[in-house]
Amino acid sequence: MTSESEPNTSLPFSPIQQTLPATPSRSTSQVSMVSAEALLSHSSPTKQLTPSHRSSLPSALPYNTLLNAPAGSPALRARASTASSSRAPSVLDDARVEHNDSETQVLEITPPMDNYELDGGSDHTSLPSDASSIKGKEKQRSNDRNEIETVGAGGEMALPSGDARKGLKELVRRSTTADKGYGGHDHRRLSEKLSQNENLQILITQSDKMSYSPRLYYVLTNAGKPVFCSHTRPSEDDVTNLMGVAQALISIFADDDDRLRYIIKGNHRVAFLLKAPLYLFCVSDWGEPEHVLRLQLEYIHLQILSVVSSTQLLRLFQRRSNADLSTLLEGTEPFLSNLIDCSQYDFSFLTSTLQPLRMAPALRDTSAAALMPPSKFKDLLYVLLIAGGHIVTVLRPRKHSIHPSDLHLLLNTIASSSALRTTETWLPICFPKFNPSGFVHAYISYVLEDVGLVFVSADREAFEDLRVWKDMVLEKLEQDKTLSRIQEAIPLHPYTISSVGCPGLRHFIYKSRQHVQITQPIWEAPYEDGSTNQKRLVTTYQKLHDAVHAKSGQASALKLVYISTEHEACLVWATKPFELYITVSPQLSKSAVVAAANNVAKWVLAEEGRIFLKDAPVF
């Protein structure tokens, strides 16, 4: 088990640092009778935790429907009351204003990418670093910095003695006597450096024994009341007892001004995210780095805040510390479940990026021109055109950037509700990275089955004006058959690895740091959707991401990491303009791996006008 005293770090690209209030103490008179095994061994799902009163979705919904919640539901009343209790401009009062040089302006016009090339050399030479050589003591310090030391949590469980709270804390206190391999596996780590600078090779020769069971996600209040459970078959009593154990563990560490981060037992890892008045935790046996689970928990928390703002949430628990939040969130379980499903394999969540629709740049520019708003809309924040679940283009005010995680929440909300795609909707929604304290309003209208317009405004009375403007935009999009051409581009968005034309290349993920966007081919054999091979490869990508971003407490981030197993070989190459993750056959030579990386980088450079949204207009 690992705990921390310093604050959590926020999502990548986010300037917000959320302060964690002190965790209230909790009586633990019975806590010495609770075993930590109950928390670690609860891996077999049995029954879904759902609110006691669930209303079915009406077949015909008015334009002001909230998600898939019925009219008059607690979630609808909560949003409506919060939105109506404050004037619309107040949403902007607390919002962050970004200057032109801000890193969070994700859709800026940027200079062309530099032509980086990886020198392959021979098989007997190491992969080169892009840094200059270091001599003497500096060279030795660099070598030392490249060693990744991973320590697992093992050892025997100690019985509690004396004070029950102290006993339970000692029961699950971390032991650092066991030497684990890279990423938390039990096999012996075999590593050799590929150069004397910032490159590292990790050879994993034993078979992967991970079972890759479905991850289990839980949300509870700081009073121990269940809020959400991801799997479908646990009994309500089992979930309540499990969350009581988790709340007791968290509370014990909080009494010492400490915070519980994660527990490791065998192949299982339990990661915690404390966002008072909510606690979130996840159980996984995939072997991923700890920050991956915490980031997924962060997204679950943000999705909850999109329905109940942080101000409303704190006010509710200040009035009643044992408030039942599940009633307020009634009808939103599909959005949390869909978010969890997407975050398992979608790398844009891990990298806090977007993957726009792949299309001709001229068609994208024509679409953006039709969406330029008139000057009379003073409180208009964002204008989006969505096709096939992907962004075609997005327009924003010059002084307000849009954070990728806020877009993820919006896209997930729309994708999770068929009502939002079939009915003209005026949706109150909180964008936590824009302003966690208030709501904005999104006008959503799908003009075709898979093509929708979204206008986000701070004015809660702007529905009729935006509705009239939508008709004007639609008329422009229908000129020159722009709308039909967008619809025709949807089935052309996915592409296969053969498009690159590189023998031995199985898969890749390319992140443009300049555009804060990614591109990747579809998952193909042997990495079909939901397969063990796909889960293993995704976990390997997560470990590579951890290495180049130093997310697990490494002394510094690496630039080039190569992992070879009996199944595949993977390479990550991090430069200033991009990050590239490639997967190749394990039989390929090092020079062939280097050549494949260069080929992918050149292919993306040639195709970036189609695969990236480069010229996002501002107004």
From Swiss-Prot:
| UniProt membrane topology term | Peripheral membrane protein
Disulphide connectivity of cysteines:
none
Task: Name the domain of life this protein comes from.
Answer: Eukaryota
Q: Where is this region: Disordered?
A: 1-145
Compositionally biased intervals (Polar residues):
1-33, 41-58, 123-132
Q: Which Pfam families match?
A: Fuz_longin_1, Fuz_longin_2, Fuz_longin_3
Composition bias of kind Low complexity appears in: 73-90
Gene Ontology CC annotations of this record = fungal-type vacuole membrane; Mon1-Ccz1 complex; multivesicular body membrane
Q: Which family does it belong to?
A: Belongs to the MON1/SAND family.
What does the protein in this record do?
Answer: In complex with CCZ1, is required for multiple vacuole delivery pathways including the cytoplasm to vacuole transport (Cvt), autophagy, pexophagy and endocytosis. The MON1-CCZ1 complex acts at the fusion of vesicles with the vacuole, through its regulation of the SNARE complex during the coordinated priming and docking stages of fusion, and particularly at the stage of tethering/docking.
Q: Which GO terms describe its biological process?
A: autophagy; protein targeting to vacuole; vesicle-mediated transport
Protein name in the entry: Vacuolar fusion protein MON1
Cell compartment(s), UniProt: Endosome, Multivesicular body membrane; Prevacuolar compartment membrane; Vacuole membrane
**Compositionally skewed regions (Basic and acidic residues) per UniProt:** 93-102, 135-145
Q: Gene behind this chain?
A: MON1
Q: What is its main location?
A: membrane
Its keywords, alphabetically, are: Autophagy, Endosome, Membrane, Protein transport, Transport, Vacuole
Q: Which PANTHER family match?
A: SAND PROTEIN-RELATED, VACUOLAR FUSION PROTEIN MON1 HOMOLOG
